[in-house]
Design a protein with these regions (language model features):
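A polyanion-binding, active-site-adjacent surface
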Residues: 2-249
Length: 249
């Protein structure tokens, strides 16, 4: 089966509807940064914390990520992979470690898995304006292996700042590493927890299969991984509409 046929499972019945531009949202308020905090040391050592409110926007944070050596991945990367999408989006998607294409281009999910993710979102008429994509770690693990616990912990403060700045209504977690990294726990495995809403600091989180896993599992039959993902993304759309309607009241 060709990649195009794989993607076609999630083809929308019509062209995706353009969503209105999101109104500028305000990042969550934070306490003042402690006097002893040294911002210049953030990219140098994981021992230096990144207090909430350190960065004013994504560009500010990206500059630090580009020179970061908080873990050993900083010495093997080509580019730090920080984000893509609308920084004021209502849906934040956390993916696993960057792959080769992402490392070369400096953007998350630009390979075949990213193309499939875009198709999945388009199938329920979610547009680029509705989403913001980031990685659980910002640098590619050698050989595309899963990021280690220490690597995720070193990079976690960047992720926390991204969540604060975007202030999403929904978080989609693709794959087990994304879940483990956000919740700081060893999950039961994506097959057991996908499709079930979880709460993280008041934000609704939906675990789904990683698109690369879907590309390796071709069946579209009822109960297959692709079929289950279709159920999950429809549930995300339902929750998205429900939260938007409540906001409009």
């Amino acid at each position: 089966m060709s990649d195009e046929q794989q993607f076609s499972l999630f083809d929308a019945s019509s062209e995706p509807a353009a969503s209105p531009k999101s109104a500028k949202k305000t990042a969550k308020s934070v306490e003042p940064i402690a006097v002893e905090f040294e911002r210049s040391q953030i990219p140098v050592t994981a021992k230096m914390p990144i207090p909430p409110g350190t960065y004013s926007d994504m560009n500010d944070m990206s500059a630090h990520c580009g020179e970061c050596h908080r873990c050993e991945l900083g010495s093997t990367r080509t580019n730090a992979v920080v984000s893509r999408g609308n920084p004021n989006a209502d849906i934040l998607i956390i993916v696993e470690g960057p792959g080769e294409n992402e490392d070369l281009q400096g953007k998350p999910f630009v390979g075949k898995s990213g193309q499939l993710l875009d198709k999945i979102l388009e199938s329920v008429k979610l547009t680029e304006d509705d989403i913001f994509v980031c990685n659980i770690v910002k640098c590619r693990p050698p050989g595309n292996r899963k990021p280690s616990k220490d690597e995720m912990e070193a990079c976690r403060p960047y992720l926390m700042e991204q969540i604060r700045l975007v202030n999403p209504k929904i978080i989609i977690l693709t794959g087990a590493s994304s879940i483990d990294g956000l919740f700081q726990e060893k999950s039961l495995g994506i097959t057991k927890i996908r499709g079930q809403w979880r709460d993280w600091n008041g934000i609704a989180c939906m675990p789904i299969f990683h698109p690369s896993y879907l590309l390796r599992n071709q069946s579209r039959d009822q109960g297959s991984q692709k079929w289950l993902t279709w159920q999950d993304i429809q549930e995300v759309r339902r929750m998205f509409d429900e939260l938007k309607a409540a906001e409009a009241l």
